[in-house]
UniProtKB/Swiss-Prot annotation:
Entry PTM: Phosphorylation at the C-terminus acidifies the protein and leads to disassociation from the acidic cell membrane. Reassociates with the cell membrane upon dephosphorylation.
Chain segments carrying region Disordered: 408-430, 452-503, 564-682
Keywords: Cell membrane, Endoplasmic reticulum, Lipid transport, Lipid-binding, Membrane, Phosphoprotein, Transmembrane, Transmembrane helix, Transport
Location of the SMP-LBD domain: 76-260
Predominant cellular place of this UniProt entry's protein: endoplasmic reticulum
One annotated Gene Ontology cellular component of this protein: membrane
Biased composition annotated in UniProt, kind: Low complexity: 417-430, 483-494
TM region positions: 10-30
Modified sites of kind Phosphothreonine: 417, 419, 428, 621
Domain-level remarks: The SMP-LBD domain is a lipid transport module, which binds glycerolipids with a preference for phosphatidylinositol (PI).
Protein known as: Phospholipid transfer protein C2CD2L
C-alpha cells in the first residue's frame, strides 16, 4: 500500500468538508434571503394597496377606468368598516362643541368666499345657522389613505336649514343694507371629507361638494311691508350669490389630538397609589380682560355724526361683549374694559369694529382674530392685529386694532363650583332715617325722626363719622291726619284742659308715645347708634315778645324748677320758688351755671360722636328748646331710648282759643310757680309720669337730670 495514498485521502477529505461547509453556508444565506423577500412582499402587498391606487395616472385616470376599479375595490374591502366610520362621525356630531365649531367653520368660510367676489352686491352670513335635527350622514367610504392623510366620501342630506344674511349694495349715490331670511333645502348630496395630520397642531378636517348640488333656496326680506325701490337688489341675484358661495366654499377646522390626563378615576384592575396627597393642579387662565382697545388708520372719510363701537366675541363658550359707541374718526379709542370667561376649549377671540348707521343697524367695518387661552403665553400682553375689511368695505392696509390682554389666573377645580365662604360684612357705614308725622286736629304736628346708624369695621369697633362716608337711606311714612272725632283715644279736642285720658295723657302725648313705641319695618335690634328725635310743632297761645334766647333759657329754667319740686316731694321738704326771676337765671347765669358744667362733664366722647348737638338740630328745625335724656338702660322706661330728644318748635303766628295743651309751657314761662304747677302743662306731666323711681344714692352720685 502506498503511503502517499493516505496523505492524499486526508487532503481530499478536507476539501470535501470545506466544499460542504461552503455549500451549506450559501444555501443558508439563500434561504434567509428568500424568507425576507417573501415577508417583505407580503407586507408590501397589504400596505401599498391604497398607495398604489394613487400612483397610476395619465389616460387611465382621465378615462376613469382605474378610478372605477379602485372605488369598486375600496368599496368591497371597506364594507365591514363602513359602519364603524359612520358611527365615529355620528358620535362626533353628537357633541355640542364639535357641532358648533363645524357650523362656525361653515359660516367663516362662506363669508370669506363671499368677500372674494368683487361685485357691488355683497352678502354676509350671520352666525350661527341652526343645524336641523334631521340632518344625516350616510354611505361613508374610504377612497384614499396614506401615512398622514385620508379621504372619505359620504352622503349629506338636510331639510330646511334657516339662517339670516345681510346684503349690502354699493352705488355712487348711497350704500343700502338689508337683512334677508334664507331657507335652504339640501337634497342627498355627496360630500368629500379630507383628513390631514399636521404635526404639533392636530388633525385638519376639510370638506367640499364633489359635484354641484341642486340647492333649493327661498329668500325673503326681513321688512316685507316696506315698498321695495329700484335701489334694492333683485331676489334672484341674491339667490345666485348664495348658491355660488355655498357650492364654491371649502370649510376647514382643526381637531386637537394632543394627549391629556384622563379626568376619570383609575382603571379598576389597577391599585390606587400609596401617595397620601395628590399634586395640586396647575392653575390656568379663567378670565380675560380686554383693556385699552384702539382702532388705528381707519381712514379719513370716517367722521361727522357717525359712531364706532368694538365687539369682542369668544368662540367657546360663545360670548359677546360690546363697548360704548365713540365718535368716528381715523383713530378711535375705547376706555372701558371688557371681561370674558375663558373655558377649556377657548381658542379664538374675534374683535369687530362696527359703525352705527342712520337706520339703527350696525355695519361691520373690519374684524381681527387672535388666539387666546394658551397657558404657555404670558399673563398680560399687548396685541396688535391687522383689520380685515368687512363685506363691501374698504380699509387702509395699515388699519389695525390694538388691545391689551390680561389673564386672571384660577384653578380648574374651582370652575363652575360655588365655594362656601363666610360673607364679609360691609365696611361702608350706613344710616337709616325714618320719619313718622301725625297732624292733630288743632294743627299741632307731631314728628318722630328715628336714625339708626351703623359703622361696622373688621375689628368690630365703631369708626369716626369723619373718616368714612355713610350711605343714607331715608324712609318717610305716610302722614297721618287726625280729625276732631278720630283722636288717638277717641277724645274730642273740645273738652276742657282737665279732661285727660285714662292714662293721664292728652292726645299729643299719646301720639308721641305711639310713634316712639310703634315697631318699624326693620328688625328689632338694640344698637347704641339708634337715636329718636321727637318734634312737636304748633302755634303759640300768646304773642311772643321776648327775645329768642331769653325765652329758651327761661323754658329750660322752668323744667329745672319742676325737677327740683319733684325731688323735694320725694326726698324731703323744700320751699318752692316764689318769684320767677329768682328761679329763672339770666342768660349769663344760665350759661355759666354748675348744672351746665356738670352736664358738659358727663357728656362722653361717644355721646358726642353718636348724637348731633342741640345747636345742629336747632339750626335745622328752628326749635326754641331741647330736652335730651341720658342713658335709661337701668330704669323701667319703655319708650324713651338712649339719645331721645324732645324738641318743641313754635310757629310765628297766634291762635287765641282751642289750642293743644302741649303749648301751655310757653305761657307758663312768665307765670308764677304756683300758677305753673296748678296748670299742669304737658311737659310737667310727661316728666312726672316718666320720672325716675329710684332715689339718689347716699354715695354722693348726682341724680340724672333731663
Amino acid at each position: 500500500m502506498d503511503p502517499d495514498w493516505g496523505q492524499r485521502d486526508v487532503g481530499w477529505a478536507a476539501l470535501l468538508v470545506l466544499f460542504a461547509a461552503s455549500l451549506i453556508t450559501v444555501l443558508g444565506w439563500m434561504l434567509q434571503y428568500a424568507r425576507g423577500l417573501w415577508l417583505s412582499r407580503a407586507d408590501g402587498g397589504r400596505d401599498s394597496r391604497p398607495a398604489s391606487a394613487a400612483e397610476p395616472g395619465g389616460s387611465l385616470r382621465e378615462l376613469g377606468v382605474w378610478r372605477s376599479l379602485l372605488r369598486l375595490r375600496a368599496t368591497r374591502t371597506s364594507t365591514p368598516e363602513e359602519a364603524g366610520v359612520r358611527g365615529l362621525l355620528a358620535s362626533l356630531f353628537a357633541f355640542k362643541s364639535f357641532r358648533e365649531n363645524w357650523q362656525r367653520a361653515w359660516v367663516r368660510a362662506l363669508n370669506e368666499q363671499a368677500c372674494r367676489d368683487g361685485s357691488s352686491i355683497q352678502i354676509a352670513f350671520e352666525e350661527i345657522p341652526q343645524l336641523p335635527p334631521r340632518a344625516s350622514i350616510s354611505h361613508v367610504t374610504c377612497v384614499d389613505q396614506s401615512e398622514r392623510t385620508m379621504v372619505l366620501h359620504c352622503q349629506l342630506s338636510a331639510e330646511e336649514v334657516r339662517f339670516p344674511i345681510s346684503v349690502t349694495q354699493q352705488s355712487p349715490a348711497a350704500v343700502s343694507m338689508e337683512t334677508y331670511h334664507v331657507t335652504l333645502t339640501l337634497p342627498p348630496t355627496q360630500l368629500e371629507v379630507s383628513l390631514e395630520e399636521i404635526p404639533d397642531e392636530g388633525l385638519l378636517v376639510s370638506w367640499a361638494f364633489t359635484d354641484r348640488p341642486e340647492l333649493s333656496l327661498k329668500v325673503l326680506p326681513k321688512l316685507q311691508t316696506r315698498e321695495r325701490d329700484e335701489e334694492q337688489p333683485e331676489l334672484s341675484t341674491v339667490e345666485e350669490l348664495i348658491k355660488d358661495a355655498i357650492v364654491s366654499t371649502q370649510p376647514a377646522m382643526m381637531v386637537n389630538l394632543r394627549a391629556c390626563s384622563a379626568p376619570g378615576g383609575l382603571v379598576p384592575s389597577e391599585k390606587p397609589p400609596t401617595m397620601s396627597q395628590a399634586q395640586p393642579s396647575i392653575p390656568r387662565p379663567t378670565r380675560l380682560f380686554l383693556r385699552q382697545l384702539r382702532a388705528s388708520h381707519l381712514g379719513s372719510e370716517l367722521g361727522g355724526t357717525e359712531e364706532l363701537c368694538c365687539a369682542a366675541e369668544l368662540d367657546n363658550p360663545m360670548q359677546q361683549k360690546w363697548t360704548k359707541p365713540m365718535r368716528a374718526g381715523p383713530e378711535v379709542e375705547w376706555t372701558e374694559d371688557l371681561a370674558l370667561d375663558l373655558g377649556p376649549q377657548s381658542r379664538e377671540l374675534t374683535l369687530k369694529v362696527l359703525r352705527s348707521s342712520s337706520c339703527g343697524d350696525a355695519e361691520l367695518l373690519g374684524q381681527a382674530t387672535l388666539p387666546v387661552g394658551s397657558p404657555s403665553r404670558p399673563m398680560s400682553r399687548r396685541q396688535v392685529c391687522p383689520l380685515t375689511p368687512g363685506p363691501g368695505k374698504s380699509l387702509s392696509p395699515a388699519a389695525t386694532v390694538t388691545a391689551e390682554l390680561h389673564y386672571e389666573q384660577g384653578s380648574p377645580r374651582n370652575l363652575g363650583t360655588p365655594t362656601s365662604s363666610t360673607p364679609r360684612p360691609s365696611i361702608t357705614p350706613t344710616k337709616k332715617i325714618e320719619l313718622d308725622r301725625t297732624i292733630m286736629p288743632d294743627g299741632t304736628v307731631v314728628t318722630t325722626v328715628t336714625t339708626v346708624q351703623s359703622r361696622p369695621r373688621v375689628d368690630g369697633k365703631l369708626d369716626s363719622p369723619s373718616r368714612s362716608p355713610s350711605k343714607v337711606e331715608v324712609t318717610e311714612k305716610m302722614t297721618t291726619v287726625l280729625s276732631e272725632s278720630s283722636g288717638p283715644s277717641n277724645a274730642s279736642h273740645s273738652s276742657s284742659r282737665e279732661s285727660h285720658l285714662s292714662n293721664g295723657l292728652d292726645p299729643v302725648a299719646e301720639t308721641a308715645i305711639r310713634q316712639l313705641t310703634e315697631p318699624s319695618g326693620r328688625a328689632a335690634k338694640k344698637t347704641p347708634t339708634k337715636r329718636s328725635t321727637l318734634i312737636i310743632s304748633g302755634v303759640s297761645k300768646v304773642p311772643i315778645a321776648q327775645d329768642e334766647l331769653a325765652l329758651s333759657l327761661g323754658y329750660a329754667a322752668s323744667l329745672e324748677a319742676s325737677m327740683q319740686d319733684d325731688a323735694g316731694t320725694s326726698g324731703g321738704p323744700s320751699s318752692p320758688p316764689s318769684d320767677p326771676s329768682a328761679t329763672s337765671p339770666g342768660p349769663v347765669d344760665a350759661l355759666s351755671s354748675p348744672t351746665s358744667v356738670q352736664e358738659a362733664d358727663e357728656t362722653t366722647r361717644s355721646d358726642i360722636s353718636e348724637r348731633p348737638s342741640v345747636d345742629d338740630v336747632e339750626s335745622e328745625t328752628g326749635s326754641t328748646g331741647a330736652l335730651e335724656t341720658r342713658s335709661l338702660k337701668d330704669h323701667k322706661v319703655s319708650f324713651l331710648r338712649s339719645g331721645t330728644k324732645l324738641i318743641f318748635r313754635r310757629r310765628p303766628r297766634q291762635k287765641e282759643a282751642g289750642l293743644s295743651q302741649s303749648h301751655d309751657d310757653l305761657s307758663n314761662t312768665t307765670a308764677t310757680p304756683s300758677v305753673r304747677k296748678k296748670a299742669g302743662s304737658f311737659s310737667r306731666r310727661l316728666i312726672k309720669r316718666f320720672s325716675f323711681k329710684s332715689k339718689p344714692k347716699a354715695n354722693g352720685n348726682p341724680s340724672p337730670q333731663l
